């Protein structure tokens, strides 16, 4: 514990104190930028907003800015520590808003325990922010503050301590009830705790379908019953006419326990008295009302959730507030109403039933994760939550009449994808175009779980027609283990193919003078990789992707044997598409040619440029060296110069030049001012390296240290689209390469 305390203190103190900062979003490098950012240029947007207030969303950060407001009277696990001491918590909230939903935050700690002061403070903030997240304000003040602000403000206000827990446990409840086979209108629910979160959650459950008279709340004084005279108006709504007076009595025969109180107040004996297949949400933090292993021992038939990350079914409010505000602000909602909260609950419940991406399982160190008793709600670090919850909330705002603008849900989802990273945006654009003409993609490693999951993604998106090659029973078994259906995914068994003899003869005719006998050809055709390559060779498929279980050379060699280089080409090479926040670059050759001569370098540049054209991007090719346009008379630089000369002669319309240093290539001002004769019109987007060592080092450094996403390797120069994965590729990497293979195949056929 002492080590954790010191670690936490060092985390907050190291470098710049605290956890957040304000960063400019516009250039600010010279006098011109100063005159635009501030006086006199700043007067122009001011005039526009004065004439038309909604223009603030166009010219300022208002539409992406949240105020996190507290007075520090009820900080989780710490109590009333005051506004200043609560500031680290509010800064942490700001990090979560930014990391999960790309929302900016001002954390504002109000120096008053008077709820009317907090209300007035928030009212005065309305011109500044797009929404207000109330945080760590004691009950019942929090109810009064939120109600008054909802009545008086025209921006969304949301008390996360109340509604976040309600929304997320609501999703868990819906899914748990499906698993135990109980109807929501028949269940008996007991709350251990009767604070803001418990009351808001109980109200949310009523809207989901739980009968109010079947909900029992217990506070520190026992059951909230009709005979008590110490209840505030919010607790009175749940005062039941029942005989039970304490938590053990209330839990007898109950179907659901929702713990929102303190550690250790629930015993195994209490759980033993609950109904069959109980649902237990023990949500006190950091230590729950009863530890999950203890609860499981008492009730093996129970479904259990906690607020902890080290047990299944973590109920974490980060699944709610970032995405709810994202959706609300993006349609300029005037409030967050019950329809929007309900939409968030149902979106989370539905997402938990979807197949879990490999990247999510890898983030949590899991090999398998599927809907069931140990997976009721999505994991907090599942990037799909943004794509499910925010659109659901936004559309609910539109449907309930509180939105200031209407959205196209599909377009909005694509905008959200872009917030998750430039690579997702780029690949989504390719996928969308392929849906009109999906290509048939062969996967020889058909029983590989990652390949199967990737095939499922491709089939669901409609961006390709995946074909798995291998033993059908093994593929079926692997799919079942991975929790993936094979619907709309074709399975081909090379060992029982009706056309095996024809394919064998085709391969034999190609390789008979390379030592291959007809008998050997017949044997190889039963191999999924050779079978797939021959299907591709004979135009029965559009592309092939392989390598998840193979070393790169072992996958490339058969491809060269069967498919070979494209007509007129002697060399194949490997490209990586490097995706940065603002730019996309293509690096070559990263995988094939160790020390290419001038002729080979020219071929690498030519085939790379062809591929980039097929993606719909105009290539601007820089031939890289340590020298700029003959500045160093050395053999290595001369090799690159000679390659450039060959390209200028053979492809005069191609934007290519060199030799040049890397900064000359990517900084257009260096190129245009110092080397105005260069054929490149602007910074290069295709970088051809002088050798494999430089290319391989560069792409890996940019990926690991520069934060670029590397998509590839993309094999170019082949007669047909064959692409070889890095061994151990994850689902996203397989999908990305398959999409690029499909684009390559479609565009190749079109020419």
How should each PLM-predicted stretch be described?
Residues 65-77, 82, 166-170, 180-206:
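Glycine-rich adenosine-cofactor-binding loop
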Residues 1-157, 351, 396-399, 403, ...:
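N-terminal ligand-binding/catalytic initiation module
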Residues 134, 205, 244, 260, ...:
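Conserved P-loop NTPase motor core
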Residues 84, 136-183, 404-405, 415-751:
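Anion-binding alpha/beta catalytic cores of soluble intermediary-metabolism enzymes, centered on
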Residues 160-161, 177-182, 186, 282-390, ...:
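Adenosine-phosphate binding glycine-rich loop
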Residues 192, 208-235:
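NAD(P)-binding Rossmann-fold cofactor-contacting core
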Residues 116, 178, 228-273, 511-536, ...:
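A structured beta-alpha segment of the ubiquitous adenosine-cofactor-binding alpha/beta core
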